Regions:
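Short, histidine-centered active-site or binding-site loop motifs used for metal coordination
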Residues: 37-39, 74-77, 172-174, 204-206
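Glycine-rich beta-strand-to-loop/alpha-helix junction loops that act as flexible
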Residues: 74-80, 107-108
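Canonical Radical SAM [4Fe-4S] cluster-binding loop centered on the CxxxCxxC motif
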Residues: 10-53
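Short, basic/glycine-rich phosphate-binding loops at helix/coil junctions
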Residues: 34-38, 69-72, 133-137, 168-169
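Auxiliary Fe-S-binding modules of radical SAM enzymes
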Residues: 1-11, 66, 180-313
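Alpha-helical elements of Rossmann-like donor-binding domains used by nucleotide-donor carbohydrate transfer enzymes
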Residues: 57-60, 89, 187, 284
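Conserved alpha-helical substructure of the radical SAM core
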Residues: 37-75
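Conserved AdoMet/S-adenosylmethionine-binding subsite of the radical SAM
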Residues: 83-224
Length: 313
């Protein structure tokens, strides 16, 4: 299943997610990633799956869910979606077939490639990440593919801003003692000024991260980021809203599919059971080992068992 949700998004409302790449295929190996360590760190773009199959799956989801209940079709992936070299074709087909805005959530690392920038030009909103303002923080926090340097990544985002007529909503992930000092925040702000996004979002780790010990900054550091960055939108709390379930036959499938791409708080998973008027799925999945309960910031999360190995590396 390439299309999933809709999931409640703090930025995009009811977002129908589309993953055109294999799990954990990315150009980064971020220490805060909720999907664990990157299995394939690469910059080579590929056709990972038949593009017609991906489009067909999106069409089935839109038909079942009803386009009126979808705010965005969002290419997000279980890694970096711009690694899919069919992304431009898929965006174009979505725009032709459905009157639903298209968003792309990207780490922004491949925007130095002209073909990537061209693939994104027909989307409505692009949401890149910019977590660092220097090479050393970039290497520590995002752990990019060896061929990607900070200046190259930043210049790609600057060039994209010059060429792109849609909206750019930039996200900055702040991690305690990594990029939340005054020096780091001011360096990030200098980079933001070059990109000139339409919106700036601050976020912090709220789900179990790839690297043990990753924590959100102290509240005072988040306030300081607000002071330095100026007008920003805050994503430092949990998302609200309901997941969409019309695309799933039962609670177990819904929990498995959503959890694989969007780790669930246990209360969210229990709510999914209630929506299907089912019970016992979660306890059964915990017993048979297909799900694992993980505590992060005093909040219980349910993750697929396959995550545990890559979260503990």
């Amino acid at each position: 299943m390439y299309a999933y949700g809709p999931v409640p998004s703090r930025r995009l409302g009811r977002s129908l997610g589309v993953s055109p790449i294999p799990p954990k295929t990315c150009s980064y190996n971020c220490i805060y990633c909720q999907l664990g360590q990157t299995g394939r760190v690469q910059v080579r773009r590929e056709s990972f799956y038949p593009k017609e199959d991906i489009l067909s799956d999106i069409g089935k989801a839109v038909k079942v869910i009803n386009s009126a209940n979808i705010d965005y079709i969002t290419f997000v992936g279980d890694g970096e979606p711009t690694l899919c070299k069919d992304l431009g074709w898929l965006i174009g087909k979505c725009k032709q077939q459905w009157q639903i805005p298209v968003a792309v959530i990207t780490n922004g690392s491949l925007l130095f490639m002209k073909d990537v920038r061209q693939d994104l030009e027909s989307s409505d909103v692009v949401l890149p990440t910019l977590d660092a303002g220097s090479e050393d923080v970039f290497r520590t926090l995002n752990r990019p593919h060896g061929s990607i340097g900070f200046e190259e990544m930043l210049q790609g985002q600057v060039d994209f801003r010059k060429e792109y007529s849609g909206k750019i909503w930039l996200e900055v992930m702040l991690v305690k003692d990594v990029n939340d000092s005054d020096k780091s925040l001011m360096e990030i702000n200098d980079a933001i000024k070059q990109v000139k996004p339409d919106r700036i979002y601050i976020s912090v780790p709220i789900r179990p991260p790839a690297k043990p010990g990753v924590r959100p900054p102290e509240p005072g550091r988040i306030i300081r980021a607000h002071e330095i960055f100026g007008t920003i939108l805050d994503l430092t709390d949990y998302e609200s809203g309901e997941f969409g379930f019309d695309n799933y036959p039962d609670a177990r499938t819904a929990i498995t599919e959503i959890c694989s791409r969007h780790p669930l708080r246990e209360e969210q998973a229990r709510d999914i059971e209630l929506r299907f008027s089912e019970s016992g799925n979660i306890d059964s999945m915990l017993s048979d080992g297909s799900l694992v309960r993980v505590e992060y910031q005093n909040m219980p999360y349910l993750l697929p068992a396959k995550f545990i190995g890559i979260l503990s590396k």
